[in-house]
Amino acid sequence: MKTKNIMIVGVGGQGTLLTSRVLGGIIQEAGYDVKLSEVHGMAQRGGSVVTFVRYGEKVYEPIVEEGQADVLIAFEKLEAMRYAHFLKKDGVLIVNDQRMDPMTVVTGAMKYPENILETLSERFKVVSVDAMAEAKKLGNARVFNTIIIGVAAKSMDFPKEQWLEVIEKTVPPKTIDINKKAFLTGYSI
């Protein structure tokens, strides 16, 4: 099997690290070699968080090079735009249709770009989901990242039941049920 590359990007506190642990868990249970790497900017202050997940028969390096990501999972539209250059030409971008204004926009120093999803759709296959709205329907906005995991799971070759088992092992015990519901919501989108 050729090495597969996944990037997860978001803003501090959005659950990118949990998402990478779930992905790493499912891949490892399937018997592949997996490497995870995290880059924290000013994450605690709403800055970018990037995680890399690489897997295959044998993986030596945890970092995904520009233009090599098979899948880019973005928890926010601007983060999708910021890291889209990591995607392969035939890569898939899974993006949460959410806007979080960075400090430069809040202070008025810059404007938030318009038509991000349309621009990205010109270059890549884009799967857009309003995971926050779906999470609010479930009564817990914090599980929007698990909804995105469900969306991403459809493009990977691992059984749904195995995903649910890994989620159960990974999330805090008191959140298992809501996270399973969130995953199934994303999986059905």
Go through each PLM region and give its residues.
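Active-site cofactor/cluster-binding pocket
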Residues: 1-189
